[in-house]
From Swiss-Prot:
Keyword Nucleotide-binding tagged: no
InterPro entries referenced in this protein's UniProt entry, alphabetically: Cyt_P450, Cyt_P450_CS, Cyt_P450_E_grp-IV, Cyt_P450_sf
GO cellular component terms attached to this protein's record: membrane
Membrane topology, record value: Single-pass membrane protein
Known EC number: 1.-.-.-
Pathway the protein contributes to: Polyketide biosynthesis
Positions that bind heme: 478
Pfam families the UniProt entry points to: p450 (PF00067)
Protein name, UniProt field: Cytochrome P450 monooxygenase BOA7
Gene3D superfamilies attached to this UniProt entry: Cytochrome P450
Induction data: Expression of the botcinic acid clusters genes BOA1-13 and BOA17 is coregulated by BCG1 during both in vitro and in planta growth.
Length: 535
């Protein structure tokens, strides 16, 4: 026994240390793998289950061309479901006849939240039971922002000139005054300023660190989730802390920047908010968010409020920047639209001034810009932000008109791309003979359709219907689309009034980028812009 103790006592300390380290590391690696295994996602098993339903599968992975698969699938199976084995999860593409069935089904049966949560791998980033979009932020957008859109317009008009001057006006000119503009990067900054003015107000919205934080969160989240999806399912839980490290740092910076503003606003009585809102309209979202967020022990949850601000900024910056980038590319590509767009805009502004206005168009005046609205809608029709809309996760079996019954656990959606390009309602129009082919850009396609008596309030950019799915449709149609529409129109008006836009000499429209079901404007593309000589 004594000899055995001596052997133990006199073993090399370093050897003991390394053995212990390897033992501990081995334990944690094994534990991580076991945890990952127990949380194994079912996307890899889903395709096998769907094969049992005898659904046609269109496309072969990896790196499947989803756009091409949708075109083939919807043309081949227009009235029945089929499967696109997209890079992230196989998606059952529902026929358009199913739209009215799924649009209002409750979360307990067909879940929008679970689909978004799964697609963004939110279980690897958020706390248990934490939602991507909290109830306070949803209430702030659905109730307050939508109801107070008119009040936000003056704020946006005030900010838009500064945003363009800062990001485009300072670029160097060539001998003829043309500037090379990296479209997506500059538009991101413009939209961050515009949205920030409403969401957090000045001066924070112009703080370079805040702008960097909101843009970085938008970009890094998408890139990080994409990287994790490329890893085998069992590695994601292990690698997530490393991959999300930069994003967590951005979140902490946002908390640091927001904390003084949140504490200052939270200390005010609600009656003081109303008085303040009457004096200035910027930063309203902060107050609305606080009004819907219960305090815990008399304290505000800065971390959750920062998450809410970053999430809504992400949604606003991402989709709006995509739309405006496409608008600049299309305006440069189809210059024949510029003169009619300017004439319409200048006419509405002149009428506004004649009526005693200051030229900053109100919500009512913006609705008079039929040609502008049509141009924006046509640009989005051919360049939708996402190819599959009304995406849902089935939490119970779903019976379809085709006779198929989809099992719970299925990811499904509707083909927005082909709906945009083949919808039959165009054919029913009395002016069908004037319409250009569906695969051709016609910026005034929808203003012509609206000119038909009875169509005046149809075919608008914000329209959500079975014929127009780019904002979704039904219970979960994008609640922020009305604010986004006005923000886009104000930015587009700034371009039309003060800038000429053209493609770089000898170049065509920068090609879109397709990743999984997403469509992005070319992030390296450039156009040329020059200040207009205003008389």
């Amino acid at each position: 026994m004594y000899q055995r103790l001596k052997e133990i006592n006199f073993r090399k300390p370093l050897e003991l240390e390394w053995n212990s380290i390897f033992l501990i590391l081995g334990f944690f690696v094994l534990a991580a793998i076991l945890i990952a295994w127990t949380q194994r996602p079912d996307e890899e098993l889903l395709l096998e289950r769907l094969k049992d339903l005898d659904l046609p599968i269109v496309g072969v992975g990896p790196n499947i061309n989803v756009s091409e698969s949708l075109e083939i699938g919807t043309q081949t199976y227009p009235n029945s479901p089929y499967v696109v084995p997209a890079d992230r999860v196989p998606i059952v593409i529902l026929p358009n006849s199913a739209i009215n069935i799924i649009k209002s089904l409750p979360e307990a049966k067909i879940s929008f939240e679970k689909e978004v949560y799964a697609r963004h791998l939110a279980h690897l980033l958020l706390k248990k039971d934490q939602k991507i979009f909290s109830e306070p932020i949803l209430n702030s957008i659905k109730q307050d922002l939508t109801r107070n859109i008119s009040k936000t317009l003056d704020t946006l008009w005030d900010e838009v000139d500064y945003a363009f001057e800062k990001n485009i006006g300072t670029l160097p000119d060539d001998d003829d005054g043309w500037k090379n503009v990296s479209v997506y990067g500059k538009v991101l900054n413009v939209v961050a300023l515009l949205s920030g003015r409403v969401f957090v107000g000045a001066p924070l919205c112009r703080d370079e660190e805040w702008i960097k934080a909101t843009i970085a969160y938008t970009i890094i989240l998408g890139v990080t989730v994409g990287m994790l999806w490329k890893r085998p399912w069992w590695q994601r839980k292990i690698l997530a802390p490393l991959y999300f490290r930069t994003l967590v740092g951005v979140h902490k910076k946002a908390e640091e920047l927001l904390k003084p503003l949140l504490e200052r606003e939270a200390a005010l009585d609600p009656s003081e908010w109303e008085k303040k809102a009457g004096e200035q309209n910027d930063g309203q979202l902060i107050r609305w968010l606080l009004s819907h967020t219960p305090q815990k022990g008399g304290k505000i949850d800065v971390k959750q409020l920062a998450h809410d601000q970053l999430t809504v900024s992400l949604a606003a910056i991402h989709t709006t920047s995509i739309t405006i980038s496409h608008l600049l590319y299309d305006l440069a590509t189809y210059p024949e639209h510029v003169a009619p767009l300017r004439t319409e805009l200048e006419s509405v502004i002149a009428d506004h001034k004649t009526a005693g206005g200051n030229g900053k168009l109100s919500k009512v005046e913006l609705t008079k810009l039929w040609k502008m609205d049509s141009f924006i809608k046509e640009s989005q029709r051919l360049n939708p932000p996402i190819l599959v809309q009304m995406r849902r996760y089935l939490t119970s079996p779903l019976a379809l008109p085709s006779g198929h019954i989809l099992p719970s656990g299925t990811f499904c959606g509707v083909d927005a791309q082909m709906t945009n390009r083949t919808v039959p309602y165009y054919e029913a129009s009395p002016i069908t003979h004037q319409q250009t082919p569906f695969d051709t850009f016609d910026g005034f396609r929808f203003s012509k359709l609206r000119s038909v008596p009875g169509n005046e309030n149809r075919y608008q950019f914000v329209t959500s219907s079975t014929e127009s799915l780019n904002f979704g449709h039904g219970t979960h149609a994008c609640p922020g689309r009305f604010f986004a529409s006005n923000e886009i129109k104000i930015a587009f008006a700034e371009v039309l009034l003060k800038w000429d836009v053209r493609l770089k000499p000898g170049e065509g429209r920068p090609a879109n980028l397709y990743t999984d079901t997403n469509v992005m404007p070319n992030m390296k593309g450039e156009v040329q812009m020059r200040r207009r000589e205003l008389i």
